[in-house]
Swiss-Prot record:
The active site is at K106. It comes from Xanthomonas euvesicatoria pv. vesicatoria (strain 85-10). This is Thiazole synthase. Catalyzes the rearrangement of 1-deoxy-D-xylulose 5-phosphate (DXP) to produce the thiazole phosphate moiety of thiamine. Sulfur is provided by the thiocarboxylate moiety of the carrier protein ThiS. In vitro, sulfur can be provided by H(2)S. The lineage of its organism: Bacteria, Pseudomonadati, Pseudomonadota, Gammaproteobacteria, Lysobacterales. PANTHER family: THIAZOLE SYNTHASE.
Length: 264
C-alpha cells in the first residue's frame, strides 16, 4: 500500500498506521488463507475473536499467531459472542493475559443472535469498566450519533458504528447518521459490519470515515484473496476521493468545455 503523508496516517491510541483497512480473522477455510488474505488487504490491524480463535489458550492446537505474528501486526482482540458487560470485560482481561499486557481491545456486546445488533446499555456499561481498567477500547456500536458521542466521552479510542447487520453484506444503509457521527467526532470513526463489496468500502471512505473493518465480505467471497485486494484498492480510492473533495450535486447540466470565446 502506498505510504500516506504522515498527516494522513490513521492514528489509534497514539499509534500511526498506513492502512485504513482493518480485517477479521474468522470464517477463512484455514490459517494459510487467513494469512494470504491479510497480506492481500495490506492490513496492519487484525481482529481476533478470543472466544473462538486460538492465540495460546490451547498450546497443542495451531495458533493464529503462527501466521499473523504480533511483531508484524497489531492484534485487536474482540469480545465477539458476548451478550453481557460482565462476559465482555472478562474476555478482555483474558486477552490481556494471553497477549502480555496488550491493552488495545475491540468491545462488542450483542443484543440477540438473530440480528447481532449491539446491546447499547451493556456496551456502555462494559466500556466504562474497561476504560477505568486501563484498556484502550475500540467499540462496536449502532449508528446512533448520540450514543457514538457518549462512547467517545467515556474514553473510547475509536468508535465503530455498523453500516448494516454483521455479515449481511447490505452495504451502507444510513449514510446520514454516519455523517453526523463523523462530523461530531474527535476520535477515529471506523465502519464495522455490513460491507458486502468494494463499492461499499469506497462509499464509507468517501463519506469521511477513518477506516473500515470487515471479515465476511472477504472471507465469504468466492475468491477471498482477490476480494481482499479489491477492498484495499477501494479503501485507498475512497480516501483519496474524500481528500480531493467531490463536486456538488446539481439538478441541471454544467458544460465541461469553456464557453467563452466560442467560434461563431
Amino acid at each position: 500500500m502506498t505510504n500516506p503523508a504522515p498527516s494522513d496516517a490513521l492514528v489509534i491510541a497514539g499509534k500511526h498506521y498506513r492502512s485504513r483497512l482493518l480485517t477479521g480473522t474468522g470464517k477463512f477455510k484455514d490459517l494459510d488463507e487467513t494469512r494470504l488474505a491479510t497480506e492481500a488487504a495490506a492490513a496492519e490491524i487484525v481482529t481476533v475473536a478470543i472466544r473462538r480463535v486460538n492465540i495460546g489458550q490451547d498450546p497443542n492446537a495451531p495458533s493464529l499467531l503462527d501466521v499473523l505474528p504480533p511483531e508484524r501486526y497489531t492484534l485487536l482482540p474482540n469480545t465477539a459472542g458476548c451478550y453481557t458487560a460482565e462476559e465482555a470485560v472478562r474476555t478482555c482481561r483474558l486477552a490481556r493475559e494471553l497477549l502480555d499486557g496488550h491493552n488495545l481491545t475491540k468491545l462488542e456486546v450483542l443484543g440477540d443472535e438473530k440480528t447481532l445488533y449491539p446491546d447499547v446499555v451493556q456496551t456502555l456499561k462494559a466500556a466504562e469498566q474497561l476504560v477505568a481498567d486501563g484498556f484502550e477500547v475500540m467499540v462496536y456500536t449502532s449508528d446512533d450519533p448520540i450514543l457514538a458521542k457518549r462512547l467517545e466521552e467515556i474514553g473510547c479510542v475509536a468508535v465503530m458504528p455498523l453500516a448494516a447487520p454483521i455479515g449481511s453484506g447490505l452495504g451502507i444503509q444510513n449514510k446520514y447518521n454516519l455523517l453526523e457521527i463523523i462530523d461530531n467526532a474527535k476520535v477515529p470513526i471506523i465502519v464495522d459490519a455490513g460491507v458486502g463489496t468494494a463499492s461499499d468500502a469506497a462509499i464509507a471512505m468517501e463519506l469521511g470515515c477513518d477506516g473500515v473493518l470487515m471479515n465476511t465480505a472477504i472471507a465469504g467471497a468466492r475468491d477471498p484473496i482477490l476480494m481482499a485486494s479489491a477492498m484495499r484498492k477501494a479503501i485507498e480510492a475512497g480516501r483519496e476521493a474524500f481528500l480531493a473533495g467531490r463536486i456538488p450535486r446539481k439538478r441541471y447540466a454544467s458544460a465541461s468545455s469553456p464557453v467563452d470565446g466560442v467560434i461563431g
